């Protein structure tokens, strides 16, 4: 008995290996059906996004200044196997890619800086001023924002509307009195971001959980931009979204850096790190193991730094 299977995915490698035919939809519309054997990955992507992609990443037209926007020195977690003795800086208008293997403690380090995790030592300066960030509220007040890696668990407020999700982090600026919110300001904020970021949503009242992953991510970025942060930490900003939406997110990141925002981008996709970073910071086992200029970054030199594990005491003794 032969059975036909429908397999839904936006991972091109899976489609090429598993499928005989590929049916492509875009914005709720049927685009067409093709034999997988006769289509390259690039051709499938072009059909998905409705245009040819000459490059997977937009050109980086930002020019990082000499001004240090944030400096971190000797940042160490209270947990002995987490991040330790981490020091780095990011300049105004720079995209700093953060690379590393699973367990490198990249997310944990950034959550610590944002006030979500406790640390035993370390200092942080924003625009030359030493700051004491003990909780996320402190970070937000010092113009730092964090887009978390799991948008469903710690990002979107699923049962709330798109308008609520965009405005939730900037309610103080959206009040028209000590208690009441200014609905016109909120709707103007939503309309501005909908146009600027090409967010596909029927109405500001639409529940965010009904949107695609890419549109949810744009809403979360819009949420933080409403506070006009100087430093924007993006943890896996394109995880779980389709290739068309990825390119749109990349364009947003590139434009923010061009405007002078300092972007820290954690990514597990090596090509994303190489394609979207002015400079790459590599971590291994809780430590920063090196920095690479963006134009010099390759998979090989990133992996060399990402695998610089400290020798365990027992192993060191055995080798003597």
Locate the predicted segments by residue.
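Glycine-rich phosphate-binding loops of nucleotide-dependent enzymes
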Residues: 3-320
């Amino acid at each position: 008995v032969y059975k036909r299977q429908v397999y839904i995915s936006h991972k091109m490698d899976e489609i090429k290996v598993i499928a005989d035919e590929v049916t492509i939809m875009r914005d709720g519309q049927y685009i067409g059906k093709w034999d997988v054997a006769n289509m390259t990955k690039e051709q499938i992507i072009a059909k998905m996004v409705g245009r040819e992609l000459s490059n997977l990443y937009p050109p980086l037209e930002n020019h990082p200044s000499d001004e240090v926007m944030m400096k971190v020195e000797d940042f160490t977690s209270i947990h002995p196997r987490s991040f330790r003795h981490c020091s780095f800086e990011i300049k105004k208008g720079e995209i700093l890619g953060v690379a590393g293997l699973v367990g490198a403690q990249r997310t944990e380090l950034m959550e610590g800086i944002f006030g979500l995790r406790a640390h035993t030592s370390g200092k942080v300066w924003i625009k030359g001023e030493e700051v004491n960030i003990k909780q996320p509220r402190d970070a937000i007040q010092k113009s730092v924002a964090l887009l978390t890696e799991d948008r469903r668990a710690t990002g979107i407020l699923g049962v709330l509307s798109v308008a609520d999700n965009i405005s939730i982090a900037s309610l103080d600026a959206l009040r028209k009195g000590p208690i009441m919110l200014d609905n016109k300001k909120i709707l103007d904020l939503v309309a501005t971001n909908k146009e600027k970021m090409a967010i596909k949503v029927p109405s500001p009242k639409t529940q965010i959980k009904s949107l695609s992953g890419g549109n949810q991510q744009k809403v979360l970025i819009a949420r933080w931009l409403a506070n006009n942060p100087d430093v924007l930490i993006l943890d896996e900003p394109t995880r779980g979204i389709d290739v068309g939406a990825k390119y749109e997110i990349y364009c947003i990141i590139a434009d923010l850096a061009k405007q002078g925002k300092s972007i820290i981008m954690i990514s597990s996709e090596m090509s994303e790190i190489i394609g979207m970073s002015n400079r790459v910071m590599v971590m291994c086992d809780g430590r920063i193991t090196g920095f690479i200029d963006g134009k010099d970054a390759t998979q090989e030199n990133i992996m060399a730094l990402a695998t610089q594990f400290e020798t365990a005491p027992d192993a060191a003794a055995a080798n003597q």
